[in-house]
Swiss-Prot record:
GO cellular component, as recorded: ribonucleoprotein complex; ribosome
HAMAP family, alphabetized: Ribosomal_bS21
Ranges that cross the membrane: none
Family as reported in the entry's similarity comment: Belongs to the bacterial ribosomal protein bS21 family.
Gene name for this UniProt entry: rpsU1
Name the UniProt record assigns to this protein: Small ribosomal subunit protein bS21A
Pfam families linked: Ribosomal_S21
Source domain of life: Bacteria
UniProt record, GO biological process: translation
Length: 70
């Protein structure tokens, strides 16, 4: 469980912001989104494979040198 201690004279909004950052850092929000609905293992593998291919194409596109203009 993520907890934060309120500092003396700290506004509530600042404490909420610190709490949200702590939760985001722990990965709790991402885990909740994953567990929101069941995803079949085959679908998860397919999604991860597609993301890997997309990353590969993006990396290759950035490494390609532009053609020489004469």
């Amino acid at each position: 469980m993520t907890t934060i201690l309120l500092k003396e004279n700290e506004p509530f909004e600042v404490a909420i912001r610190r709490f949200r950052r702590a939760i985001e850092k722990n990965g709790l929000i991402a885990e909740l989104r994953e567990r929101q609905s069941y995803e079949k293992p085959t679908t998860a593998r397919k999604r991860k494979k597609a993301a890997a291919v997309k990353r590969l194409h993006k990396r290759l596109r950035s490494q390609m040198l532009p053609k020489k203009l004469h």
